[in-house]
């Protein structure tokens, strides 16, 4: 959802952004400008008529006091009132049309975002850690997990169908250890406040963060109760401050939560059908920040370093890439992905996305702060995975495997076992 002034004053720039994103309905911007213009004209006409009605109403009062006949002027007031209702109805129609189009528009791109059409055009920023070498052919995480009897995919499928799994014994303990380790680092070292949030949210929450209305088919919904299973803790964490005005001296606010996440993975048929990479339910530790606009770039960098710090402590090799215009999410202005090395799969795999949304979500969710001069302004929101537990789990299995089938546990996790 974009600023209407920006749309009207930067039409050609906006069209270029949409083209870079691969947005096909470029002509909708001209339609949007026409709606904005009609809305202004209706608003102006309604204001003039209200002023006319107010003057006439005062005149009615004066005539009444003097004992005169108000029949004619009362009829005139009534007629003006009917015209106002008619214009207000048209105004409401234009406002609804405006909102529907604006809710479907993607965010403005940061100038640093490289042009491109797909993930193949993303640019590697840097690599961290040494890729391990093995004196044997490394196994995949699902082979290791099944051999250790830590992961049982068959029982997961029996319970929930495809893309499901169960953890057992030390395998279950490893997942719990990762959760506690990540939360401890983020709360004790990175100064985030831990929050426990619901796994079901209302439509307003999904709308504010940008999942609805455009991507409604990608998520699980409980129609009877009008609730949605969260695809990420970004949704409930960001909506903690929906429709609120935050005092300036409370910013920046940094919150974190561990939750289950639920995704239909409707567009991923045939991709990563085995293992923990692409599943319908997974655990994740999420990071969200609310800050002043002038601080968002620096806070974005900080969050990226916080997510990286988890991988550094776990001694997992990774790289950071910047997403191109054709691969970045519609809601984000700029996104850095962290990809961890997977020896068994013999490729890098996304383990975290860290995004700056600028005021895109704040405008949808009416999340504002009151500045020292008393003005209400939109905050900027930033979010990132810190990290996805299942993929971190998979990376540990593949990077810390031994030739005899045993597994080494990262030093930082040993105290959690």
UniProtKB/Swiss-Prot annotation:
Report which superkingdom the organism of origin falls in: Bacteria
Location relative to the cell: Cytoplasm
One term under GO cellular component? cytoplasm
Pathway(s) where this gene product acts? Aminoacyl-tRNA biosynthesis; selenocysteinyl-tRNA(Sec) biosynthesis; L-seryl-tRNA(Sec) from L-serine and tRNA(Sec): step 1/1
HAMAP family registered for this protein in UniProt: Ser_tRNA_synth_type1
| UniProt cross-references to PANTHER family, sorted A to Z | SERINE--TRNA LIGASE, SERYL-TRNA SYNTHETASE
- Protein name per the record: Serine--tRNA ligase
Q: Which organism is it from?
A: Leptospira interrogans serogroup Icterohaemorrhagiae serovar Lai (strain 56601)
């Amino acid at each position: 959802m974009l600023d209407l002034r920006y749309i009207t004053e930067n039409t050609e720039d906006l069209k270029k952004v949409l083209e870079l994103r691969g947005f096909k309905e470029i002509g909708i911007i001209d339609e949007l400008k026409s709606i904005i213009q009609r809305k202004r004209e209706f608003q102006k006409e309604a204001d003039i008529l209200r002023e006319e009605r107010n003057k006439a109403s005062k005149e009615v009062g004066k005539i009444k006091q003097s004992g005169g006949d108000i029949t004619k002027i009362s009829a005139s007031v009534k007629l003006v009132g009917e015209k106002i209702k008619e214009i207000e109805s048209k105004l409401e129609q234009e406002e609804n049309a405006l909102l529907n189009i604006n809710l479907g528009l993607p965010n403005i791109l940061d100038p640093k975002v490289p042009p491109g059409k797909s993930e193949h055009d993303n640019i590697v920023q840097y690599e961290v850690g040494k890729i391990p070498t093995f004196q044997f052919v490394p196994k995949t995480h699902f082979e290791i997990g099944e051999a250790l009897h830590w992961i049982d995919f068959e029982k997961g499928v029996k319970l929930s169908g495809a893309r499901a799994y169960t953890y057992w014994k030390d395998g279950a303990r490893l997942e719990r250890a990762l959760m506690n380790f990540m939360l401890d680092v983020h709360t004790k070292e990175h100064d985030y406040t831990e929050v426990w949030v619901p796994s079901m949210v209302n439509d307003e929450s999904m709308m504010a963060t940008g999942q609805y209305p455009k991507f409604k088919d990608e998520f699980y919904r409980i129609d009877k109760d009008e609730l949605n299973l969260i695809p990420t803790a970004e949704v409930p964490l960001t909506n903690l401050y929906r429709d609120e005005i935050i005092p300036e001296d409370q910013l920046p606010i940094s919150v974190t939560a561990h939750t289950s996440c639920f995704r239909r993975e409707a567009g991923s048929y045939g991709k990563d059908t085995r293992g923990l990479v692409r599943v319908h339910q997974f655990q994740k530790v999420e990071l969200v920040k609310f800050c002043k606009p002038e601080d968002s770039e620096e806070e974005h960098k900080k969050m990226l370093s916080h997510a990286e710090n988890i991988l550094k402590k776990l001694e997992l090799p990774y790289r950071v890439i910047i997403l191109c215009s054709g691969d970045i999410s519609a809601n984000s202005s700029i996104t850095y992905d962290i990809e961890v090395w997977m020896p068994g799969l013999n490729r890098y795999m996304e383990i975290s996305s860290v995004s700056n949304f600028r005021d895109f979500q704040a405008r949808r969710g009416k999340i504002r702060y009151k500045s020292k001069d008393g003005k209400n302004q939109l905050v900027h929101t930033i979010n990132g995975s810190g990290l996805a537990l299942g993929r971190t789990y998979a990376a540990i299995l593949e990077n810390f495997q031994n030739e005899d089938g045993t597994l080494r546990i990262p030093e930082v996790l040993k105290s959690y076992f």
